[in-house]
Structures are given as C-alpha cells and as structure tokens.
Amino acid sequence: MKALFIGGTGTISTDVVALAQQRGWEITLLNRGSKKMPEGIHSIIADINDEEAVAKAIALEHYDVVAQFIGYTAEDVKRDIRLFQNKTRQYIFISSASAYQKPLTDYRITESTPLVNPYWQYSRNKIEAEEVLMSAYRTSGFPVTIVRPSHTYNGTKPPVAVHGDKGNWQILKRILDGKPVIIPGDGSSLWTLTHSKDFAKGYVGLMANPHAIGNAFHITTDESMTWNQIYQTIADALGKPLNALHVASDFLAKHSDHYDFRGELLGDRKSTRLNSSH
C-alpha cells in the first residue's frame, strides 16, 4: 500500500514513517527537502503551499493514505481537499488535544469532549480546520480521519512545560548547571506524556482502517505524572538535584507574551488533563 506523508521528518512523524515502512508501506515524503531522506523512502521535493506544483507532482499518483502533519488552518485543509479529493482512500489530519474545551469541566478527556479554546489561536485554527474537513466528509465523502496528539516527546525533544528561545534543551542545561527551572503553578497538576514511538503504533493502526474514516481519535499513553514528577525524573536521569522555581501560570501568561505562555499554559498545560479513549 502507498502512503504520502506531507512533512514526515518532525518529532511525531519521523517514528510514524519508520514504523509504517517497517510494516510494508511504500512511503513518499512531500516536503522542501531540507532533511536527508531515510533509505527506501521516495521523495517529492515541493512546498505544499505551492498548490499548482504539488498538483503536477501527484497528477499520475493515487494513494491509500495521505498523512498531513503540517496543516494548521482552515485554508490549509481546503487546499488539501482540492488536491487530494479522488486521490486517496484516506486523508489523516494531525490536529491537537489542546483543541479540547478550556477551561476544563472534567479532567477526563475523550474524543467527544467539546472543542473550545479561547486562550490559544493555534488550537482555534486546528478546530476550524477540523470543521472544514468534517463538513467535506459529510457533503462529498472526503475520507478524513482526525488524530489529536497530546504532549508527545522523543529523544531529541524532552518534555518540559515552558522554555525560552533556546528550546527544550535549555531546561536540561540549567538543571546540569544547578540553576533554577520554572515549573508552572505548584507543579501538582497531572499531565499525560506520550513517546513518539508509542504514538506511531496507534497512528499506523489507523492507516487504511475503514472504520477510522469520518472519526476523530486522540493517541496518548495511559500514564500520567505531575509536572513536579516529570521534572524530577529528568533531573534524576541527569544525575543532578532539581532546583525548582514554582511560578503561577497566570503570572507567566500575563508577563511572558514573547513566548506565548498564555496559549501554551492557559490553553493547554495549566490544568490536569487525563486523555482516555472510548
């Protein structure tokens, strides 16, 4: 079976591509070619935003799955519908678990939890994209499956709550140097983390699955930890003591516009969230 991955080299998608290939999928990556292609992977070097160029590149192709990992807005998916209508048996869109209702009315999150996020434009854009896709499914049979990842990490992107311009590894460097690291709130809220290899198992299971068409799924592990536990685990792995500085999430959101902490904290990581699938 053939799959076209739009993107395919990011934190989440790299392990999905590897597992799909391992299970016998013929994989093509459509991206701008800035990273080396894994062995055995086909490549279409193009900018997905150049609709005419992409249409020419796939003119003679048909895919069992189109996997969209870099779609963010309603306009992005409208373009994809034009490109891939009648070109694929399944279109899988990566949304976000941050789209679920905020503030939370129940810490237990399922796929039927309403999609409302007044704090983060990123999440609202994902919600609008989902609405466009589900409308296309209902009106024209566009074969969409929606996947909502939660906080996903891997060996190159360790899980932290907030960081500055130097990224996630800045936090690990501060721990190694004995410097304080910020933990939002009192660090007691529960959080679900998922390794990208675990995410890949769930994702590949949805590929070419006819029961997944027209449905949304979040893919997470069933283990939850407090932010204090998460940071302590990182410090223990580094062999260093944790020098935690607890700062109220509302204060961080108010005074840290440069880093968009309002969106990431109030719109996602401030509250306890336990993802559970039906």
Residue ranges and their predicted role:
Residues 205-267:
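Mid/C-terminal beta-alpha module of Rossmann-like enzyme folds, strongest
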Residues 131-160:
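Conserved beta-loop-beta element that borders a ligand/cofactor-binding pocket
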Residues 61-108, 117, 124-135:
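NAD(P)-cofactor binding segment of oxidoreductase domains
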Residues 3-23:
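N-terminal Rossmann NAD(P)H-binding glycine-rich loop of SDR-like oxidoreductase domains
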Residues 163-171, 184-207, 214-215:
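Substrate-positioning beta->alpha
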Residues 272-278:
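Conserved small/polar residues in nucleotide/adenosyl-binding loops
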Residues 37-50, 70-72:
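Rossmann-fold cofactor-recognition segment
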Residues 107-111, 115-131, 151, 161-169, ...:
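Short-chain dehydrogenase/reductase
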